[in-house]
Amino acid sequence: EIVVTYTYETIPGDEFSLGNAQVTVVGPVKSYAEPNNTSIVMRVAFGSTVFLFTGDMETEAENDMLDYWGDKMDWKADVLKVGHHCSNTSTGYRFLNEVMPEYGVISLGKDNSYGHPHAEPLSRLRQAGTVILRTDELGTIQAVSDGKTVTFTWENQGANPENAETAAQTVFIGNQKSRKFHSPDCANLPAEKNSVEFSSYQAAIDAG
């Protein structure tokens, strides 16, 4: 038996079909010394549902992708495969603000030596109102799209995803000087005279 293997170097904008789904390669958009930033990023669209896979890409390359595509790419996704096992080097605010996923799936081992998932990206996902599904809690996770909605099943029936409804309704505190916003429990809240309240994460984003 002879096995022939072909390799193909992708470039941003490459498209191919996967059954009835359309796959678009959206990154990386340049070369990097850091191997994690060379992860292939794929946008998978099936019907009106969208999945985004970012591999181990870090915030530097996330931001470069946003700059490269500008307004030519719709980053909104129903499901985000959270970058780098939910490391604090990935899933930055700017990138997450564009994607605004309904669901975030985190692949990681239980009690891993890296401390994943890190608190910072978890906080960002919660602030965005994302429902978080973790393999260390749920076991194997399967997402199924019918082209209109995405449904999930998981191995550990005794566990449930983290429901983000409360996070989506949290009041956020904006700093009128720095133009940044914080969750109410942040240790770096602005002085009262410089603060402004937003009723939701999206309201804070819309205010710039």
Regions found by a protein language model. Give the residues of each.
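Mature, structured domains enriched in cysteine- and short glycine motifs
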Residues: E155-N156, N160-G208
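Non-globular, low-confidence helical/coil segments that flank catalytic cores
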Residues: E1-A168
